[in-house]
Amino acid sequence: MTLLKKVPGPIAVLMLVIVLSATATWLIPAGEYNKLAMADDASHFKVSTATGSVALPLTQQTLDSLNILIPLEKFTTQAIRKPVSVPGSYHALPKYGQGVFSILQAPIKGIYDTIDIILFILIIGGFMQVFHESGALVRGIEHLSWRMRGRETWLIVILTFLFSFAGSSYGMAEEALVFYPVLVPLFLAAGYDLLVPLAVIFGGTQLGTLSSFSNPFSTIIASNAAGVSWQEGLDGRVLMFVLSTAISVWYIVRYAQKVKKDPTASIVYQVDGAVSPPYDVATDPAAPKGPLDWRTRGLLLVFACTFLGMIGGVIFLGWWLLEMSTLFLGASLLLAVLLRLPEKAFVEQFIQGAEGLLSVAFIVGIARGVTVVLNDGRISDSILYYSAQWVGNMPPALFVVMLLCLFMLFTLFIASSSGMAVLTMPIIGALAMVVHVPGESIVNAYLFGMGIMGFMTPTGLMLPSLALVNVSIAAWWRFIRPLLLMLFALCSAFLIWSVVF
């Protein structure tokens, strides 16, 4: 317990990971695969090599000759946009060891690379502060808590399912950050601790990563890169969605009920002590529980429409961070008009809200710095190459389980699901053919490994999520460890079954 309490904060952990990654660039041989991509004018393929780039005909024969098992139309329709690794093309490079100056530059470069996410988070903070000042959020939460008394468990069941479904279907990830200021007060008012909303929101979306059945950023891109249809293995992934979500809901509900019965049983209380999230969540249990007034209903309607608009825009209109940020900025201005806020008061509240999430924004940027160091040191492909050589001659059942473990390892270095797919799938896909493992099994191993490791990797959304509820890494790891062991056993059994039967 004493050791757990000594775990440093999120930013210190990330800087330590950056230092370790820089050290690895001196120990692991540098190297890379040739990368194939369609030219900007869509007239030919462009292959990047150690000595430059080569133009090749934009034909299926070109892909076949390079042993890239991807139909040509996946490139011409831009289903695959990022450069794809060419199997068998790995070559050594001179060492690109990253020194002290590179370590100091890494978080700055990471912030540059993630400025769209950072601005999204800051604008969310401003929006939530303006809305919170209206008092409608507190009154709405008090009203909902009163209406749900005795049925709080259903909040966990329904919301975990919804977040898991959103992650599995269209890849909800960064968008879920907006729900913490809304749901944390609701779960605290129900008598739970800070781990419960964290497990529901972050855990739910991460379950969606693990069991993605139609996520365009992982399942579809990975299937395309592996040369199989994303619909192959769809029934199995839907089954995994049901099983993994059911196990997680049972685990969260069991913990929540224990904490509600005895607050001292809270892992947050035992590890972190009495902590509170970085924003005001105070509600009044003794407040009148009559119907909401029309002003509050109107403000809550604007609030709900903003979130529904975001979800609808992502699913149906292809929105991403620019459009979502614009939506929340516009909603903030609309609230200012409805609340008749003076210009100075609005700006002060908006800036105050953004300041409250500034540490979260920095964590996102610094986390990207890990990838910057590995890429600048030219060892990301080397890790993939030596890992592929290691598992290449294993029997199918052992091969898929080792792939699961390897993808867990890769998640530490490659936080982007689509980036990992186009870098690894052509290489792993070629290996899978040699050991007679079907393509959908390697896609599932990729999803399972990335999903499980995403619960605890410091380079993903774990640390920003922890910062939003002010829970330590030690408390989260202690809470999530038993669940991850169950999910790992489930995923391993499913993969073995898929190649044996």
Regions found by a protein language model. Name each.
Residues 2-11, 32-47, 235-349, 469, ...:
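Long, contiguous bundles of hydrophobic transmembrane helices that form the permeation core
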Residues 2-13, 180-271, 290-297, 460-494:
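Membrane-core helix-loop-helix motifs of multi-pass transport proteins
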Residues 8, 391-501:
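C-terminal transmembrane helix pair
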Residues 10-19, 47-138, 319-382:
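Core transmembrane alpha-helical segments of multi-pass membrane transporters/permeases
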Residues 13-27, 121-129, 162-166, 208, ...:
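Hydrophobic core segments of alpha-helical transmembrane domains in multi-pass membrane transport
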Residues 112-118, 146-158, 190-196, 354-362, ...:
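Membrane-interfacial loop-to-helix junctions in multi-pass transporters
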Residues 121, 152-167, 192-207, 233, ...:
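Alpha-helical transmembrane segments of multi-pass membrane proteins
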Residues 122, 151-182, 364-374, 390-430:
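Hydrophobic alpha-helical transmembrane segments of multi-pass integral membrane proteins
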